[in-house]
């Protein structure tokens, strides 16, 4: 298999893994990741105005046809001695060029990025970037050679094995500092996700114990990650644990304790108020549908039935949005579908 095909497989493997591991990654995580990996601001110098103008003027030759209206995504950073600072921005730059594969050959991509470095970077950063790029290419090629673990994909051990093999592969091509810069943010999230899965899948823990451990795990995250992941992560944890408690016939107290451990007293109070509102809505809709069915089963004319149902709907649901909402339940019931109540 030639190198370009292996690069392609490497890209495919990364895409497959990211579908799994970034299943709750918020859209602005990339920004958070950049903040996590940032070095002391005083040690970083931005590209000079002259260099910025040059990069803007030379954007088109480096992009593919599908990227003709975009700027080159290469926010490379240098320190005061013009040494390359290896961080997620560096990796993003490499990946920007690699996404052109298919529209351009790997040889053309390689030449483009070298030309880009020549035009945009002073020495010694230029040579450092080119050397790192060559090693990154080899790393991506070897990703395509990694063997899939002989473990069911439903088992967390499968993903642990995949990430372990990737970490070992990185050590062949990069220093510890480079690994931290290129992959540090990804590793933080990967480790968090794997540990979170392990807690949720631990049958030896009660839902209350899971909530405590999930809260402790979340509290260990860097502050920037907490800000991005808090809502999505906790909502998903709440959904899974709540479903489990209800499925197993858990008590209201167990549900209360789980929520309190996971999101605190104030949020639990709001959730319990929402439970009351949902319960009232479910009761009202169920009663309305029963009365509506009685009308439909009566001997009245079709016109009389529709008038009676409209009057019944207006009586039970005064808010216009509720009247529209309940019609979705009417349709579901008429078609023999499950009623779309929120749980």
Curated annotation (Swiss-Prot):
InterPro entries: Lipase_chaperone. The chain crosses the membrane at residues 7-27. The keyword Cell inner membrane applies. It is a single-pass membrane protein. Pfam families: Lipase_chap. It is found in: Cell inner membrane. Its main location: membrane. GO terms for biological process: lipid catabolic process; protein folding. GO terms for molecular function: unfolded protein binding. Belongs to the lipase chaperone family. May be involved in the folding of the extracellular lipase during its passage through the periplasm. This is Lipase chaperone. It comes from Acinetobacter baylyi (strain ATCC 33305 / BD413 / ADP1).
